[in-house]
Every structure is written in C-alpha cells, then in structure tokens.
Amino acid sequence: MITIISPAKSLDFDSSIADIRSTEPSFQDESYRLIKKLRTLSKKKVRSMMNLSKDLTELNVLRYQEWEPEFTLEVSRPAILTFNGEVYRGIDAKNLSESELHFAQDHLRILSGLHGVLRPLDRIRPYRLEMGVTLPIQRKRNLYQFWSQKVTKLLADELEASESKTLINLASSEYFKAVDFTKLPGKVITPIFKDFKNGEYKVIMTWAKNARGRMAGYILRNGITNPENIKLFDEYKFSEPQSSEEEWVFLRG
C-alpha cells in the first residue's frame, strides 16, 4: 500500500530536527531542467505565473539562482520535516519515531512540481513550484505533461511490488492530476472528509487538508499496509452508505 500527499508552500528550514539517515530525490536531472527554465523568466513573469507578492517573487527568484542539484546537510533537509502546511501539521512528522519515519520512507510519497515524486526522507532545497503552474518546457505545455509519465511509472512500479497493490490518495486534486491512475495496477482509494456544519455534512477545505494529514500520520504510526484498516481512523467515522469503491467518505460531527 502506497499513500500519496501533496507538498506545501510553506517551508521550515529553521527548526531543529532529529538526526536521521536521509536520501536524495529520484529525478534530479529533471528538477535541474525546470530550475534552468525558471531562471530564464523575468521577475514580472514569475510573479504573474505564480500569483506571488513582490517579496515572495524576490525570494523565489533568488532561490532559483542559488538552487543546485546538491543536497548537503548545510542547504537541504528531509522533505517530510521541511514542508509546513496544514497537511503536515496533521502528520506531525517531527514527533514520528525513527521506525515510523522509516515506514514512511517505504510507504508514503509526496508529489511535487519541482521533484515529481519525493520520498519522505529525500532532502530538498528551498523552492516554490506548484504542479498547477503553466510552465511550458521541452515541448510539454505544462508540468502535468512534463511529469505524468515519470510519476505514474514510479508509482506503478512501487504498487506492483506492494502486497495490497492499493494507492491511498490523500493528495489534492491539483497534484493527483499529475498521475495517470488508469495505468496503475490495483486500486486507487480517495478518502473524502466531511464535517457537519449548518445542518449538513460538507467538505470544509482547511479541515479536510488537516484530516488528510492526520490520516497519513495515522497510517504511519500504525504501520498500516491493509487499506481496510484506514476505516478505523478514529478522528472521523467511515460512512459505508456514502462511500463507493473509489471514494471512501469519512464524517465528523
């Protein structure tokens, strides 16, 4: 069983982290091609393309200039301990044990606009490049076309080697669109999280993001390899009547 999640815009390169054996990203050549393309863009283009403030534009243009495919301890950190958005607050990776982090390394994948796919302990340098950005490169119209074949093949190979051949999709729709799920072996299950508000159950985006992270953390802390066991996630209640084979609905409230 493989679980996929999205990255985060916010990065933490300042807090202290435990010393753990780390790895390097799988698609460094492809990432460097993207960086070199980004270096050719004007600040005005970067700002409009990514909808950034002036300060964030300056920061990320500098990041592109400084970025190199070198992942030393001085300039990079493990991805799961660096991304810092709502999903990652849900995972609470800094409080995972060493054995839980090693389980994550084998069973969790992070989709990325710059790196394609990251293992949790792959070291990353500061960057910002969302999968939905329209960045034409190498006859590809956008990052979906650039990454889809590589990302899909990597996930397909890992699923083929897994016991349950099941992908748990906890990524956002922006990132999951990079995966051609028709070419994956086995099942793809997308958990949907709904909270009770104003008399009905509905997806509330911030809470749903956090819930995706909490479910990912639940999978890692319990060493789950059988998808049926995620139905026992104790922060939401699995709803059999509202679920289908591909979408599992979880309710709270």
Question: Each predicted region: which residue ranges?
Answer:
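C-terminal accessory regions
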Residues: M1-I2, K183
